[in-house]
Amino acid sequence: MRTSAGADRHLPKLTSCNEIRHMRPLRIAPLVALLACARPDAAAAAADGADTVVVFTAASLAVPVRAALDSFARRTGAVVQQENGASLELARRITELGRVPDVIALADQEVFPGVLVPRAASWYARFARNRMVVAFTDRSAGATRLTASNWYEVLSRPGVRVGRSDPRLAPVGYRALLLYRLAEGHYGVPELASRLEASTPPALVRSNASELVALLQAGELDYIVDYESLARANHLRFVTLPPAIDLSDPARAAAYALASVRVARRTDTVTYAGAPIVYGASVPRAATHPAAGQRFLSFLLSPAGQAVLRAHAVDALRVPELVGDSVPPALRATRQ
């Protein structure tokens, strides 16, 4: 959840975000979107460009969505294109640069009501969860002593190099800071959040996860604070953190919300409150190939698509939720 102070003229002025946030979600049946598995006929493909699907993907979803796109292409014959980046950066490519994909899949579903709805998108799907972990390699300083109970001591020691993503661009960046605040309360260690933040100097704050992974694997970093799916996709070692702080448990939403961080942007400051990690996806209003985008998203939410996500350590929701009044009929028809 986010609130902002000041004006950001680079983002759309949203007048109905609260309306979208409080729309009743639509539950999608597990037998969702069999249409996604059927190849469109040639006339339909020619009419709406269904043979091409362009997808913007949050960095932590890059590998799972690539696998899903490949599976979709094999089933339908579609030409698939993927562009990866930090979630907030991807959203701004749409709102500021006018570069509009057929599907956008982001690491924080709140980016939709906060940035994209209602101008760039009119609905979105909540489709997956994740958890925060501490990833490392055998060469990491203190790796032989690292455990789930002392990770914060190891990371806050002098000389240990910890990387994290830029909270102005990537949800995982502000989630790392929220993790630190929750850890301070959970472990009862005064000033722990400040100490953990100090373990990452500005030079080790990067715009996307791929840079952090490369630095970690090259030995330029000792640890990165990121998602479990990213660690698994890159075959990194990682420490699983307590559910009380790893932002994975929907039942702990109220407890997570007790933590908050303020992030200074170009023209304003945004406050993010802790919340369970939930991924979101949509077909933007100005998509070039909207029907093809809907077919791919239907596939991604189907049992076959969910299986691909789970194979890459993404906790796909068995019953995804659709939020908004303008859900495409092909998706709406699948709800219970």
Model regions: which residues?
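Intrinsic disorder/low-complexity segments in short proteins, especially the signal peptide
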Residues: S16-E19, A36, P40
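Short, intrinsically disordered or compositionally biased N-terminal tails of bacterial proteins
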Residues: R2-T3, R9-R24
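Extracellular/secretory pathway and lumenal proteins
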Residues: R21, L31, P40-A42
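Short beta-strand-centered segments that line the small-molecule binding cleft or hinge
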Residues: P101-D108, F112-R126
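Bacterial N-terminal signal peptides
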Residues: R27-A36
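Exported/periplasmic ABC-transporter solute-binding proteins
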Residues: A38-P40, A45-L97, D108, L116-V117, ...
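Short, solvent-exposed loop/turn segments at the edges of secondary structure
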Residues: R129-N130, P276
